[in-house]
C-alpha cells in the first residue's frame, strides 16, 4: 500500500473546492458591475476574491488534519530539501519565461512588434483594491497548496498521470469560469478578446497541467515545484507587453514540448503511478 491510497476523498475535496469559490466569485462579479464603485464595494470584491482563492487550500487542510499519515506526507513534500534543485529551477524558468520569449521572437516573423519585449511593469488586468501583481503571485501559492497538496494525489490514487491531468484540466477550466464575469479581471479580458483567445486559454490550461504534473512527479511530488512553475508562468505572461496572438504561439510551443515529453516518458503518463 502506498501513501496515495490515503488520498481517498476526491469527491469531497473537489466538490467543496468548486462550490465555495464559485459562490464567492459570482458575488465578486456582482459587486464589480455595480455603477458606483465605492471603497466598500472594492474591499468587498477583494475579500470575496481572496476568500475564493484560499478556500480550496482550507478544504485540503481540513482533510490533512484528519489523518496523521497524510499530515506527515504533506510536511515531507513541503520540504525544500526534497528534489528542489538548481536544475529544477532552471528547467521551470526555461519552460515559462523561455517559452514566452521564444514565442515573441517567432511572432516578429509574422509582423508583430519587438515592443513585446518591453517590460511594462503593468499587468494586462486590474484588481479591486489590491495590486494585480499581488493576485499573480498569491494565487499560485494558495492554489498549489490545494491542487498539489491533496487534489492531484487524490486523482493519481485512481487514475494514470495522463488521465489525472485531463480530468483536472476540465475541472480547472470550469473552476475559473466565474472569474470571467468579474469586470476588469484577466479572465473577462480573455473573453472580450474573442473566441480564439478563449479557446487558446482553455487549450493552454490542459498543456500547462500536463507539464506541471510531469514536473511534480519527476521531482518527487515536491509541492514547491508546482508553486514555482505556476508563479513563473503567471509572471512571465504578464511582465512583458505580449500581444494576445503571441500567446497562441506559446501554446503551440507547449504542445510540441508535451508531445516530446509524453513520447519520452510514456510509462510515467500511462502506467499506474506509484509514489
What are these regions (language model features)?
Residues 146, 150-151, 182-193:
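Membrane-interface interhelical connector segments
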Residues 136-141, 173, 201-206:
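Residue-level hotspots within the lipid-embedded alpha helices of multi-pass solute transporters
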Residues 142-174, 217-222:
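Membrane-interface helix/loop boundary segments of multi-pass membrane proteins
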Amino acid at each position: 500500500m502506498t501513501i496515495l491510497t490515503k488520498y481517498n476523498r476526491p469527491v469531497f475535496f473537489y466538490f467543496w473546492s468548486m462550490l465555495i469559490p464559485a459562490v464567492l466569485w459570482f458575488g465578486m462579479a456582482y459587486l464589480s458591475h455595480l455603477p458606483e464603485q465605492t471603497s466598500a464595494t472594492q474591499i468587498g470584491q477583494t475579500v470575496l476574491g481572496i476568500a475564493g482563492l484560499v478556500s480550496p487550500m482550507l478544504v485540503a487542510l481540513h482533510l490533512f488534519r484528519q489523518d496523521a499519515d497524510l499530515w506527515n506526507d504533506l510536511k515531507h513534500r513541503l520540504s525544500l530539501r526534497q528534489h528542489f534543485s538548481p536544475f529544477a529551477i532552471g528547467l521551470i524558468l526555461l519552460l515559462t519565461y523561455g517559452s514566452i520569449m521564444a514565442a515573441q521572437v517567432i511572432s516578429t516573423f509574422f509582423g508583430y512588434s519587438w515592443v513585446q519585449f518591453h517590460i511594462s511593469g503593468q499587468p494586462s488586468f486590474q484588481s479591486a483594491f489590491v495590486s494585480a501583481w499581488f493576485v499573480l503571485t498569491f494565487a499560485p501559492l494558495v492554489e498549489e497548496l490545494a491542487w498539489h497538496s491533496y487534489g492531484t494525489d487524490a486523482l493519481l490514487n485512481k487514475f494514470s498521470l495522463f488521465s489525472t491531468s485531463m480530468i483536472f484540466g476540465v475541472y480547472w477550466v470550469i473552476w475559473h469560469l466565474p472569474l470571467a464575469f468579474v469586470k476588469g479581471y484577466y479572465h473577462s479580458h480573455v473573453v472580450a478578446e474573442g473566441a480564439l483567445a478563449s479557446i487558446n486559454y482553455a487549450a493552454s490550461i490542459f498543456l500547462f497541467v500536463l507539464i506541471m504534473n510531469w514536473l511534480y512527479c519527476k521531482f518527487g511530488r515536491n509541492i514547491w515545484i508546482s508553486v514555482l512553475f505556476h508563479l513563473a508562468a503567471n509572471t512571465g505572461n504578464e511582465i512583458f507587453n505580449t500581444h494576445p496572438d503571441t500567446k497562441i504561439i506559446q501554446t503551440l510551443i507547449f504542445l510540441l514540448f508535451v508531445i516530446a515529453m509524453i513520447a519520452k516518458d510514456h510509462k510515467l503518463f500511462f502506467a499506474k503511478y506509484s509514489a
